[in-house]
Amino acid sequence: SLYAPSAMVFSVAQGDDVAAPTVVRATTVSCAPGARGTHPDPKAACAALKSTGGAFDRLLSEPNPDRACPMHYAPVTVSAVGVWEGRRVAWDHTFANSCTMAATLDGNAVF
C-alpha cells in the first residue's frame, strides 16, 4: 500500500484504571487512504489526529477559562489505541471528572 496504516480505537471510560476500564463509549477510525469508521465524524477526527503529528498530548488544550467545573473527583479516562501512520500507539489521559474532560478537550473532534 502507498499509505502507512492508521487505524485507531478511541474510548471514554469511567474511572482511572486503564487496565480494567468501564467503557462509556468507544469508536473506531481508519484514516488512510480515506477517513472511515464508527466515529460520528471520521474526517474531522483524522484531521485532528494529523494535526498532532503523532504527539497525542496535543489533543489536550488549556481548559476553557469561561467554564466552571465542580471540584468533585469522578475520574474519566480517554484512550487511543491502535496504529497511527504505521506506528503502534497506546495513549491515555485521566481527567478529574467529565466536566474537566469536556473543558480540556474543548472543541476536539476525536473524543
Swiss-Prot record:
Protein name as catalogued: Subtilisin inhibitor-like protein 8
Q: InterPro entries, alphabetically?
A: Prot_inh_I16_SSI, Prot_inh_SSI_I16_CS, Subtilisin_inhibitor, Subtilisin_inhibitor-like_sf
Localization recorded for this chain is:
Secreted
Q: Name one GO molecular function term.
A: serine-type endopeptidase inhibitor activity
- Key word Lyase present in the record? no
Q: Does the keyword Disulfide bond apply?
A: yes
- One cellular-component annotation, GO: extracellular region
Q: What is the disulfide pattern of this chain?
A: C31-C46, C69-C99
| UniProt cross-references to PROSITE patterns, sorted A to Z | SSI (PS00999)
On subunit structure and binding partners, the annotation says: Homodimer.
UniProt entry keywords in alphabetical sequence = Disulfide bond, Protease inhibitor, Secreted, Serine protease inhibitor
Q: Which family does it belong to?
A: Belongs to the protease inhibitor I16 (SSI) family.
- Any Pfam family hit: SSI
Q: What does this protein do?
A: Inhibitor of subtilisin and chymotrypsin.
Residues at the site labelled Reactive bond = M71, H72
